Amino acid sequence: ITTRLVGSEMCIRDSDMLTLVISELYKKHLYLLDSDKVDSFDKEIVKQLIQGTASAKDTKGSLMLLTRLMYQQYGKPVILLIDEYDVPVAKANSNGYYEEMLDVMKGLMQALKDNQALCFAVITGCLKIAKESIFTGTNNFISDTITDSRLNEYFGFVQSEVDQILKDADVLDKAESIREWYDGYHFGDFDVYCPWDVMNYLLELQRNPKAKPVSYWKNTSDNAVIRSFIDYAGSNITGKLETLLAGGTIVQRVDENLTYDYLHSSENNLWSMLYLTGYLTKPREEDYNGKLADGT
């Protein structure tokens, strides 16, 4: 399930978007309505979730219910994948209904707590999950971020993958321009390319071999949190941004344990947010010359 669509103010007032997301999820499991392993009471709740007429309580408990019913159906613990868990929380924080959204998300995340039907869950988001209060009471998290080394090569395309893609597409002559435009990240020992940018540019090259690289990723992100920082930026922040835009380097302490309700409590949180969400990256050791901007 992806919670990306859940996050408009309408969602908080009448749960329209959440109801739609859950309905679409349950439509993929219509077999439960015909199963002799699901009792009539649960089938009625499933029908209501599909139709969008379920109570708020049943909607919040829908992930817990679905994992339990799938376990009953197949006799195997369920793997739960939740994509972009924090998009609704970020949007709510930007629009003034953070606490209400936390209540909604807490209900959904009950599926992670004391759930005998759950094998394990994989959750993705911009901010580290351990401290966000929607996960209160959930134990045994293993959190991997871009500052760790275990999964660095999986955050995007590494150089060997890009080389093979360009070879397969017969556009090896574009390697240098693609590196300059889309090789924007350095995680551990890996240079990492943005897959969305690379694939969109290759698609455009198939249509027009003379196409120039452009930034495709910038149109897919919600920049409300970043803009809110910039709106209140003082001269210190402005100066550092100018240094970065000029290709320079600044030194800032990165705090991985951010929560959205405290994002604006310090300037350092801005740099942490920019780094954790991919707007900034750390320099390669061979590119770092030790020269720092004043005040860093």
Question: Where do the protein language model's features map onto the residues?
Answer:
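Single conserved hydrophobic/aromatic residue that forms the stacking wall/gate
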Residues: 1-7, 11-12
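Amphipathic alpha-helical segments of the small helical/lid subdomains adjacent to P-loop NTPase cores
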Residues: 133-136, 144-203
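Accessory beta->alpha helical hairpin/"wing" motif in late/C-terminal subdomains of nucleic-acid enzymes
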Residues: 284-296
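Structural recognition of the conserved hydrophobic beta-strand(s) that form the central parallel beta-sheet
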Residues: 79-83, 119-126
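Conserved helicase/translocase motor-coupling segment
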Residues: 211-273
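Conserved P-loop NTPase "ATPase switch" module shared by AAA+ and STAND
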Residues: 74-98
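Substrate-engagement module of ASCE P-loop NTPases
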Residues: 65-71, 100-119
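A short, conserved structural fragment
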Residues: 275-286
